[in-house]
Amino acid sequence: QLIWEAIKGAAPFFSIITEIGLKTIQSNPIKVIEGFVNLNELSLIMKLSEEFPENISLQWIYAQKVYIYIFAEFKSFLEDKRTEEFLIFLEKFPALKKSFYENFNEINFFPKELKLYEMNANNHSEVISLLGGDLENDIPNFIKCLNEIMDKKPNNSCYVASQQLGCKTKKSNHGSSFFVHRKSTWKPWIYASWKKNDLQEKKVVMDWMYESWS
């Protein structure tokens, strides 16, 4: 039964698409809290984020240092009040800055200070990703593993990142669509990059990626 559901969910990708429909959604104001944090701070923020309501989401990227984004969408007075109660906790991290935007399109991602884009036309890259549930009490172990992975990264173009998918993905919505729903909170990924045509560096980088993921 599960296999059949998965096939039905994948059907649009196997078919010839002749028509599509677009539906717009209401654009709401967004508060963004962002900045560099250390690993201990990341651990605390991840623990808090697993209690976030569905209108708040944490994303982070670990390149040379850890940079986080927290997005909070403001929809109604009651939701806004609850949202601010969660965000008050973040006042204890002085390096984080707050910005307010009228809509999502105004937001700029990944500041130049991250120095991510040593990546260029002369680089090739590979990404590996997977969905995962709440870490809960395993957050300290996750942070320890993350630090070990980054200690071994082969060059400055490689990084690890994760996106919090949102509250609704924690719920099993069996039968709500033809897609197979999984209880998921986090979408971590590893980005690996190497110089074009440098097979030796490619092997080192890919070995790092596979070892990190295993």
Describe the role of every protein-language-model region.
Residues 1-214:
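Soluble FAD-dependent oxygen oxidases
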